Amino acid sequence: MLKLFTLLIFLTSLGSLEDTTSNESLYDIKIEGIDGNTIDLNQYRGKKILFVNVASKCWFTYQYDQLQELYTTYKEKLVIIGLPCDQFRNQEYGTALEIKTFCRLNYGVDFPLTSKIEVKGKNQHKLYQWLTMKSKNGKKNSSVKWNFKKYLVDEKGELIDVFYSFTKPMSKKITKLI
């Protein structure tokens, strides 16, 4: 009886050795666009996606020029999604209209922008949970410590790499992966 009990415990413990990574797909996540409409990431299957947490009053705001250039250059195979965030020294405008107007008038931004989101903390958006947690993205853990951190995802919705704020959008580090 003891042998049978030991065998049952052993077999039960094997189940806990299974891969604990999430099967949640990036494409299951929805984001509110800057105009209030839902952005369904599923529409971007087959294209790479560069996610960038942006802020209009940040030292890195100049990167909007290169983000727009990158988007225009690789539009057939890449989408850039700018995600306004106010978590780093309140460097984003208050309303969606202010953000959208600033980006369009000053930088000619025509890639998708979302409503303001939280990229860290207890109210971290589901997208950023996926981007920053290996248990969800299957590749690596990371944290967002400042504006203009970039996450590149491939055509199948798998994380390729993460780039810090100092990495310019048109750098070879990014363009060679597109």
PLM feature spans:
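Conserved helix-turn-beta segment immediately C-terminal to the redox Cys motif
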Residues: 47-48, 57, 61-85, 104-107
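Thiol-/selenol-based redox modules, centered on thioredoxin-like
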Residues: 126-129, 133-178
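Sec-dependent N-terminal signal peptides
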Residues: 4-13
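N-terminal "domain-start" segment that seeds a small globular fold
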Residues: 17-42, 62, 126
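Short, internal strand/loop/helix patches
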Residues: 97-147
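Thiol-based oxidoreductase modules, predominantly thioredoxin-like and allied folds used
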Residues: 53, 77-94, 109-121
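Amphipathic alpha-helical repeat scaffolds
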Residues: 33, 53-57
